Amino acid sequence: MIKPRTPPGIMELLPREQIAFQRMLDVIRRNYERFGFLPIETPVFELSDVLLTKSGGETERQVYFVQSTGALANAAAAADEGAENGGLPELALRFDLTVPLARYVAEHEHDLSFPFRRYQMQRVYRGERAQRGRFREFYQCDIDVIGKDALSIRYDAEVLAVIHAVFAELGIGDFKVQLNNRKLLRGFFESLGVAEGELQLAVLREVDKIDKRGADYVRDTLVGEGFGIAAEQVARILAFVAVRSEGHADALAQLQALEASVGASATLGEGIAELREVLELVKALGVPERAYCLNFSIARGLDYYTGTVYETTLTDHPQIGSICSGGRYESLASHYTKSRLPGVGISIGLTRLFWQLREAGLIQGIAESSVQAMVALMDETRLDDVLDIARRLRIAGINTEVQMEPKKVGKQFQYAARAGIRFVVLAGDDELARGVVAVKDLVREQQFDVARDELASTLLVELEQAKAMP
């Protein structure tokens, strides 16, 4: 007999936890739609040459490739399949939703209205090293705005407002959206003589590791043999990326001070102007000052980000790390089309976020079941009555389960309690003869009679009151 088990790096939930997870998905979806984003889905696997066009960083080394059983069984066929794509299998599982989005927009460009506002909530796959809190299969919940030829920086501010709306409704504690612009980093590097190209991108990736690995690690890496940057330059880089702001006025003051201290640089000036406009619009969008700040160390590891970048953290739980991140990209879709399709977006890694919140004891106030009432069957002869009662409750919008086999009342109460069902409806001979049913509230341990015709309205009131209970 084979032992039942899941592969490492998978989060599989019991129904009560799945309900909590699903409700978080619902909150995210609801807020995405409130801001006018439209849903799409893309295939779980893409053509390898399309998917790996410009991922960069660690991600490309974590891709799962897909081969047919026929290709695996026939070595020659497998070799032929791989030879068409530089030795790689033809298909690969998506590692994020941004690259498939770029392919989607380029492929359907003539059928879409621009700016195209999309949300997408699907699983993605990465070959992470199996360890606690790291997942190989996980949900990402993304929004992106794609423009045609150009995309106003104003959308960067709106995306931040969406982040705020989502996490404010999720109610998981105070949070802060940390803002930066990669043009600031690039312009500053240019002033130090760190040239454009691969070196600059590599330095950006290392800077992005400061919060996880620490400044000493980044310093040692940048002065080491792989980079060979002078210690004095590295010290200036670390001082630059240590800049933080508190409050709206301080953020603007930090940008003004940077502009005065570094001097003329087209790239740096562009980044400062973009960040300044984002900050002003975020204020106009009603995002409270406590919810955002500048953090010049935020770079984002993926190479396709070119301007604004975001990372969101929980104020009281910094150990959880980033709970939402993203940024602007100018040229990702240019690998699939001659049209210029710039975009800006963010992603919530919901699987890891849920796991971290559960570990921290922050998943609270969630009903244990999506079933709101159960109608007990105590006598086979009353099945038609029980089914009619359940039908009426469902018409009223109450999620209702029916016990299809007669059992002792005590056993049905035990079942409902274990399943997390709060209200049990009893329709025995005595109750039905009086034109009533009995309702057992398993949380308050109270039982009351209600007229059969008034059951649905009474339960709706009880359910509304139950929502308000701590």
From Swiss-Prot:
Main location: cytoplasm
Reaction catalysed by this enzyme: tRNA(His) + L-histidine + ATP = L-histidyl-tRNA(His) + AMP + diphosphate + H(+)
GO biological process: histidyl-tRNA aminoacylation
Localization (cell): Cytoplasm
EC number per UniProt: 6.1.1.21
GO molecular function annotations of the record: ATP binding; histidine-tRNA ligase activity
UniProt-listed InterPro entries: aa-tRNA-synth_II, aa-tRNA-synth_II/BPL/LPL, Anticodon-bd, Anticodon-bd_dom_sf, His-tRNA-ligase, HisRS-like_core, HisRS/HisZ, HisRS_anticodon
CDD domains documented for this protein: HisRS-like_core, HisRS_anticodon
Subunit-structure text: Homodimer.
HAMAP family per the UniProt record, alphabetical: His_tRNA_synth
Similarity comment text for this entry: Belongs to the class-II aminoacyl-tRNA synthetase family.
Protein name: Histidine--tRNA ligase
